[in-house]
């Protein structure tokens, strides 16, 4: 099964309620920061098929689109024609799901269901890890989560987890995918950066795109950092 690099990056954090006066973090990428404490990131759990997290990638969703196209492709009735599944725009998938003919919409719906089961399985395995077992909420970002198709896939995975009596809450980050990582960078930057500057040039390298922008620092306790 051809998986691509994960487009969904899940980082578990714990919000700090107090910060020692005059605390200065001197290491970029430090775990202990004024607003948050980074507990776990980049889980490299593997099995015989490779990295488990790759099954929750945008590439995995495209794989399921292709799988659901095969029955119609075999009889020459693929509604997507010769278009590669990996190159179908998210907006086109959203439009087909909402207003497309029944078979085209059914392909998208089938891929959503298949991907949701895969995502729920990945999250269950992650939540068994020591660093994840106490997670109260998992927040999804990235371009896939910003589409209606992505929202439904994540929402369906959340329902599947609830059916397994898993209490960890599943949310989608409220900021636009192009802005979310840049906003978060200000909370992960070392404090010395803001001793003489009001903002930083943040860079977000995702699974598909690279984004850069000016990010101002604000206390995590004064903003709605989650939905």
Stretches found by the model and what they are:
Residues 2-227:
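ATP-binding/phosphotransfer module of carbohydrate and carboxylate kinases, centering on a glycine-rich
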